[in-house]
Swiss-Prot record:
Residues at the active site: 8, 131
A GO MF label: 1-(5-phosphoribosyl)-5-[(5-phosphoribosylamino)methylideneamino]imidazole-4-carboxamide isomerase activity
Pfam families named in the record: His_biosynth
Alphabetized UniProt keyword annotations: Amino-acid biosynthesis, Cytoplasm, Histidine biosynthesis, Isomerase
Catalysed reactions listed for this entry: 1-(5-phospho-beta-D-ribosyl)-5-[(5-phospho-beta-D-ribosylamino)methylideneamino]imidazole-4-carboxamide = 5-[(5-phospho-1-deoxy-D-ribulos-1-ylimino)methylamino]-1-(5-phospho-beta-D-ribosyl)imidazole-4-carboxamide
Location within or outside the cell: Cytoplasm
Keyword presence, Amino-acid biosynthesis: yes
PANTHER family associated with the record: 1-(5-PHOSPHORIBOSYL)-5-[(5-PHOSPHORIBOSYLAMINO)METHYLIDENEAMINO] IMIDAZOLE-4-CARBOXAMIDE ISOMERASE
Record bears the keyword Hydrolase: no
Name assigned to this protein: 1-(5-phosphoribosyl)-5-[(5-phosphoribosylamino)methylideneamino] imidazole-4-carboxamide isomerase
Length: 246
């Protein structure tokens, strides 16, 4: 079970948002590359980057910070990026620049043809980020709730050839209220591709609960606010996951 620290980028800084609101940003570091090195030193085996400006603008906006992170740790652990990835040229630039995976969110829902083409052109590199509330998919930085059922969409994307699904329960993200394990398991059971849990990881109870259902196809979880504000010790969490998964 991978605990994957998130580095959320806004205006070149590492921040955390509350429930996806740009005006609710807390700055944790002025140097995202140093932050990346910190997580690597703590035993991270993968990093999750989000270009927040990019997510809202529809194209990547934190290129310098992303490049600095990849220069710092890209040769040592896989790095994945989401936020504003809406065309094949952007994906190509990301992969050529050293990213292992790109995460497609809103564009997957709005433009499934693009997702299909991306999976064909870059097999093994495409992750879909599905954000849902009460089982329904949300788009556009969580601002719009669609009528799409999350399991139905995920199955379709699996057929396209996506590498994995990151499932975020947006009612919980950044609120430190615990992961929605039940909904994540329900999704993982319906798929054969891996699922990464996200949204609301708070403490060791979440790690224990996740490891108990690892066999359903849940391979990791994104760690955000909890590992930044100190309520969850990252290294201890990964050590626990390794022990329980052994």
């Amino acid at each position: 079970m991978l605990i994957i620290p998130a580095i959320d980028l806004k205006d070149g800084q590492c921040v955390r948002l509350k429930q996806g609101l740009m005006e609710q940003a807390t700055v944790f570091s002025d140097s995202p590359a140093e932050q990346a090195r910190h997580w690597l030193n703590q035993g991270a085996r993968r990093l999750h980057l989000v270009d927040l400006n990019g997510a809202f603008a529809g194209k990547p906006k934190n290129a310098a910070a992303i490049k600095a992170i990849l220069a710092e740790v890209g040769g040592e652990i896989p790095v994945q990026l989401g936020g504003g990835i809406r065309d094949l040229d952007t994906i190509e630039a990301c992969i050529d620049g050293g990213l292992s995976y790109v995460i497609i969110g809103t564009a997957a829902v709005k433009n499934p043809g693009f997702l299909h083409d991306a999976c064909v052109a870059f097999p093994g590199h495409i992750i879909v980020g599905l954000d849902a509330k009460d089982g329904k998919v949300a788009t556009d930085g969580w601002s719009k709730l669609t009528g799409h059922d999350v399991v139905d969409l995920a199955k379709k994307y699996e057929d396209y050839g996506v590498e994995s699904i990151i499932y975020t329960d947006i009612g919980r993200d950044g609120m430190l209220s615990g992961l929605n394990i039940e909904a994540t398991v329900r999704l993982a059971q319906a798929l054969t591709i891996p699922v990464i849990a996200s949204g609301g990881l708070t403490g060791f109870d979440d790690i224990r609960a996740l490891c108990a259902v690892e066999g359903e196809g849940i391979v990791g979880t994104i760690a955000g606010r909890a590992v930044y504000d100190g309520s969850l010790d990252f290294k201890a969490a990964q050590d626990m996951a390794d022990e329980l998964g052994a």
